[in-house]
């Protein structure tokens, strides 16, 4: 492997932090050495210092784009996180399509950090199934890695990557090609792919308050705290009031950023720009035109573009003008308490409190008695309007005689969303108990989490590990089985299942579980390391040496963090490499070089 000084690695880490917001600690310097070994020969460079000069000189931005995929994990999949996509399919996207049609505009969505495109294609399939046309949708998918963006544009996926797409969707939206499937042109029309660095201080392609939905999942785990906060400021400014932000399942803004409000949608926790947030309203930034689109200043005003005209034609009869779509509401009209509930207003839309009352309440006229008051037999008229409150005045009861004065229009207090602790934070509390050696409290904490979130993958894996550490092997097996039931391709359930079996002395089971994990993810270094330990226990020293060497060899590939938590398991590339080399040296009875 290339030899690079600590100073060069620190300079490279500082550049990645400054230019891309990536925080790489000394534990991750092994991945930087691997990246240098891969990029320097391509550029014809022999000294790491010259590579640093290339990054900081002309053409440095282009080289940065080539470097980043080597130090980050671009793992993604179709319909990733079933709970979030259930919320998108059942509530979020249907509401956005309906609302955008009412407002005669496009649904505006940003898939930020889209990698090779599985996420935006998943969104496009759902939108198509909801009946949204491609011309009704502006689905912008971006990534810093331009090679990944180009691959996403092609829409080609191997059979293994397409495994989570059901057969009906494969038949409708893809055509079989060699070694996999290719998205049909009709599906690709929904998406426009582009390069975008999320760490830049200004998004010059995004207008203020223009987006309905942003998905930025499993991206901010690579960023340092200032970069995350700056990115959240820009996301908040880009979303419409009431717009939603989806982060990765294990990502939380708890004690990081408090300007979003967290809400629950069909079991998924998401972040929302407050409805009454006016702090970001300002003259919109100039939007970069799409390729081939005339500049904003060069566009000639037209009474109605083709998009709006098409929507009018499909949504309204030709003889009905737009202004007659909704009936006029008379201020004096009276609705009985049992009348149908009022339709909720669109998010961010203003409405008079006399015509629309938030929540499912009966329509109420300003001049009709409140239902609760009208039901009281001893009151024959409404209470008078009250000015200032006199604390010395005795409390008013229903025994007061009727007062014939003009009543106030009723108001309804809508309770604020409760402050909810996200699953990731609840799990972190249990992990702290585990670190303190309080396993009973840790188990109880994770079990309470799973009572509320029964399919929480991190929780299931951590609970299995807690059972394993406390000798409750059958319960550990059950927890890992539930994790596999939720995610059939869950590598971690196989890895931790192998560890539990190893602790119980079930070496055949341990070998089987770890082999299954490596079948699913052959480059997982920790899997090879643990399998080597199983071989050592069975006295198969040759197989153990081979597995330790495999663990070291796989470190040339980026290693992702495992879901779930197991204390003191080597997790960084350097830690795995060091442990494997020591074990290998001990087996070979040779001193470390």
UniProtKB/Swiss-Prot annotation:
Class of enzymatic activity (EC top level): transferase
Reactions catalysed according to its record: L-glutamyl-[protein] + S-adenosyl-L-methionine = [protein]-L-glutamate 5-O-methyl ester + S-adenosyl-L-homocysteine
Its job: This methyltransferase is one of the proteins required for the normal aggregation of M.xanthus cells during fruiting body formation. It is also a component of a sensory transduction pathway that controls the frequency at which cells reverse their gliding direction. It may methylate FrzCD to form gamma-glutamyl methyl ester residues.
Domain of life: Bacteria
One Pfam family hit: CheR
Name this protein carries in UniProt: Protein methyltransferase FrzF
Keyword Transmembrane helix in record: no
Gene Ontology molecular-function annotations: protein-glutamate O-methyltransferase activity
PANTHER family for the chain: CHEMOTAXIS PROTEIN METHYLTRANSFERASE
Keyword list, A-Z: Chemotaxis, Methyltransferase, Repeat, S-adenosyl-L-methionine, TPR repeat, Transferase
